[in-house]
UniProtKB/Swiss-Prot annotation:
GO biological process: asymmetric neuroblast division; embryonic development via the syncytial blastoderm; follicle cell of egg chamber development; G1/S transition of mitotic cell cycle; G2/M transition of mitotic cell cycle; germarium-derived cystoblast division; male meiotic nuclear division; mitotic G2 DNA damage checkpoint signaling
Annotated positions binding ATP: 10-18, 33
Residues annotated with Phosphothreonine modification: 14, 161
Impact after mutating residue 43 to D: In cdc2-E1-4; larval-pupal lethal with some adult escapers
Substitution effect: residue 148 to R: In cdc2-D57; embryonic or larval-pupal lethal
Catalytic activity: L-seryl-[protein] + ATP = O-phospho-L-seryl-[protein] + ADP + H(+); L-threonyl-[protein] + ATP = O-phospho-L-threonyl-[protein] + ADP + H(+); [DNA-directed RNA polymerase] + ATP = phospho-[DNA-directed RNA polymerase] + ADP + H(+)
Stated name of the protein: Cyclin-dependent kinase 1
One term of GO molecular function: ATP binding
Length: 297
């Protein structure tokens, strides 16, 4: 640890405090994620070991790089490359009447999806995608951070706990208690983020799990066996759910062109089996004519 110094606290991560720091040897500015260990007996928590092992495997230009792992007494520090801005802060910093440039939205969506495709091909889910853990720099690069809740998945997909994704970006199969889920949970989250970039407003701002579901149902209509076979058998599905019968999504997306709307509709398909894949997102007509170079924000 003597090679690093803390400069200031910059936030609370999933497992502990995050500091801006400096490498004393190179002068490089870094992000230091401190994970407190409960006691000396327990050693490094399995959650941290999982995060470390994942991040060391995931080397990609759109994934935050883990530089080093350090132990100090009953603490572990994860040393990451430092980016000072995240997508939420960036959107919040724009004037109220200003929308993100459409080319920047396309560029960010392409980069985020490229990172997630890279993960999905390695059998890794992120499971906690949200604007707060998408870090950006001035050159137009966006990187996915905080794989704290990511986990390698095998085939068949294991039964997971379902407390994972921040409420507003949480997939319906998770909210309805599905014991098995896979890559489509990340696609749903990206669809919500895409809509938020295009409109400056979160699409489904629920304040409880049931409120979150009802907000989805109001906009996308209440799912039925016809559009989502098996939905009524999910543990938290109730026959008493209100029945909204029209899809209002297009009304929420006034700033998007027809290809953009079509892509979001495919990302927000209720049935995970039919939700678009990361690979197919990148090949969608929304990206026709798009040069995958960076767009300055």
């Amino acid at each position: 640890m003597e090679d690093f110094e803390k400069i200031e606290k910059i936030g609370e991560g999933t497992y502990g405090v995050v500091y801006k720091g400096r490498n004393r040897l190179t002068g490089q500015i870094v992000a230091m994620k401190k994970i407190r260990l409960e006691s000396d007996d327990e050693g490094v928590p399995s959650t941290a070991i999982r995060e470390i092992s994942l991040l060391k495997e995931l080397k990609h230009e759109n994934i935050v790089c883990l530089e080093d792992v350090l132990m100090e007494e009953n603490r572990i520090y994860l040393i990451f490359e430092f980016l000072s801005m995240d997508l939420k802060k960036y959107m919040d910093s724009l004037p109220v009447d200003k929308h993100m440039e459409s080319e920047l939205v396309r560029s960010y969506l392409y980069q985020i999806t490229s990172a997630i495709l890279f993960c999905h091909r390695r059998r890794v889910l992120h499971r906690d995608l949200k604007p707060q853990n998408l870090l950006i720099d001035k050159s137009g690069l966006i990187k996915v951070a905080d794989f704290g809740l990511g986990r390698s998945f095998g085939i068949p997909v294991r039964i997971y706990t379902h407390e994972i994704v921040t409420l507003w970006y949480r997939a319906p199969e998770v909210l309805l208690g599905s014991p098995r889920y896979s890559c489509p949970v990340d696609i749903w989250s990206i669809g919500c983020i895409f809509a938020e970039m295009a409109t400056r407003k979160p699409l489904f701002q629920g304040d409880s799990e049931i409120d979150q579901l009802f907000r989805m149902f109001r906009i996308l209509k209440t799912p039925t066996e016809d559009i989502w076979p098996g939905v009524t058998s999910l543990p938290d599905y109730k026959n008493t759910f209100p029945c909204w019968s029209t899809n209002q999504l297009t009304n929420q997306l006034k700033n998007l062109d027809a290809n953009g709307i079509d892509l979001i509709q495919k990302m927000l398909i209720y049935d995970p089996v039919h939700r678009i894949s990361a690979k197919d997102i990148l090949e969608h007509p929304y990206f026709n004519g798009f040069q995958s170079g960076l767009v300055r924000n």
